[in-house]
UniProtKB/Swiss-Prot annotation:
Gene (name only): ureG
Alphabetical UniProt keywords: Chaperone, Cytoplasm, GTP-binding, Nickel insertion, Nucleotide-binding
Record's GO cellular component terms: cytoplasm
Protein name: Urease accessory protein UreG
Positions with a binding annotation for GTP: 13-20
Protein task: Facilitates the functional incorporation of the urease nickel metallocenter. This process requires GTP hydrolysis, probably effectuated by UreG.
């Protein structure tokens, strides 16, 4: 029997920033080393859960899609009962569960996870929204445990400066870390994994190379 509860990793961010792409990449990289499951949140559908299943991220019984209705942030903050129930269900199905990724529905920069629901929070933004996003602040930018700045390969095409985003992220976050990624190509993924293992106090499994 395992000696500690499953690590709950909340992954938030605006629509289209790359949350589901990050969850998919994390599952595929870690599933042979850890007992993993996923909870996704969508307002009216289970689209993200179905996407992860279709793309073979995990077996279907390890993915639960929650239909939140209304504002997505309510289901991860003010009333997290549906998500807590889903996490509880997964723990019952898989007693050896080590990590649960909880993907929020797409929301604005003010969305945050309840500490009752998430042990670690990752917040995903993308350069296509403009290099001004980090300095706009909001709890996702300033208080998440890790800020993921995705789609860096598209920066030149949309006129976004990674140097500006780097500077503003440092100013807004202080000592809190951030990582630039191109999840489509896997760039930066190992650094995200290393952060989760280190800060989530997971045992580094044999065969999983350090970042």
């Amino acid at each position: 029997m395992k000696d500690k509860p499953a690590l709950r990793v909340g992954i938030g961010g605006p629509v289209g920033s790359g949350k589901t792409a990050l969850v998919e990449a994390l599952c595929k990289a870690l599933r042979d080393h850890y007992e993993i499951a996923v909870v996704t949140n969508d307002i009216y559908t289970r689209e993200d859960a179905e996407f992860l299943t279709r793309n073979g991220a995990l077996p279907a019984d390890r993915i639960i899609g929650v239909e939140t209705g209304g504002c997505p942030h309510t289901a991860i903050r003010e009333d997290a009962s549906m998500n807590l129930a889903a996490v509880g269900d997964l723990n019952q199905r898989f007693p050896e569960l080590e990590v649960v990724f909880i993907e929020s529905g797409g929301d604005n920069l003010s969305a945050t996870f309840s500490p009752e629901l998430s042990d670690l929070t990752l917040y995903v933004i993308d350069v296509c929204a403009g290099d001004k996003i980090p300095r706009k602040g909001g709890p996702g930018i300033t208080r998440s445990d890790l800020l993921v700045i995705n789609k860096i390969d598209l920066a030149a095409g949309v006129g976004a400066s990674l140097e500006v985003m780097d500077r503003d992220s440092r100013r807004m976050r202080g000592d809190r870390p951030f990582i630039f990624t191109n999840l489509h190509a896997g760039e930066g993924l190992e650094s995200v994994i290393d952060f989760i293992i280190r800060e989530g106090m997971l045992d580094r499994k044999p065969g999983l190379a350090p970042a």
